[in-house]
Amino acid sequence: FINTLSPDLKNRTIFNLETSERTKFSFVPIERRGTSFKDFDKYQKKAALKLLRASLSKKGYNKSEKIRQLEKVLLKIEIPRLVFKGKEIIRDYLDYHFWLFGVPSKDSLWGWKFEGHHVSFNFTLKNNKIISSTPSFLGANPAVVNIEGFKKLQVLKSEMNLGSMLVSSFNIKQNKIAQFSKNAPIDIITKNDFKARKISPLGINYNELNSLQKKLFLKLLNEYINNYRFGFAEDLRTKVYSSGIKKLHFAYAGEINSSKGFYYRIQGGDLLIEYDNIQNNANHVHTVVRDLSNDWAESILKDHYKGQHKIH
């Protein structure tokens, strides 16, 4: 990817690993630094997409690309145009940005970011291996598309359906434990904070589920984990399981299949997954995965810099 860029594009794409730009995290339509598809010729676009494809699973890559296509839908249906922070927003599926942090090589520590409206992936690599892919955000607006030419596209369908199926399976006692509010929060609770605040692990514990519910719960959990490239997905799965699958909780708020909105989260150990669908009469989904101890490879970078300090 780097080798396809002109000197000017390199200057706008490559940053130091230590820059605060690396840990900026946003999923709304704002102006961003880095370079975007709008800056690239067809060869650079191809190389950029190849980098993204190499960093995600096929499932994660396809979701990301379909979310970009939703910008075309919004361009058709948003009349009058959305005004955000005093500026009219013109939807553009090319307005997705790339940053590289540090010097990519098989022996170095470096990172890169892909971000635009409703997509944010943050990767850190060491010794040619992805060691962090969080925070990661995927959203969909509309959650279900019902206009000509898009065949009722529903990008985050499994996230919605599996969560709804799990809630629908609860008996009265389980539901009282799992539901922490009749009203869904207006957005994901951790927002786009650099450091996701630790929130209470409310809801029903994995041990309180029956065997079929446990299977549903794990299928839902893995729907999120399997967006990542296989190696990192397995590392994250191992971390979650080794810290104790029995410590995981599922909590929800609002109502399924309702225009009032639906929210759920999976939480345990360092893992936090949030799903929220309340905006636009519950047709606008936000999802996020956070590693409370290692977003942006925070814990690994601390050890790395400690080691450098000792050497000097």
Model segments located where?
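A cross-kingdom marker for long, charged
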Residues: 1-312
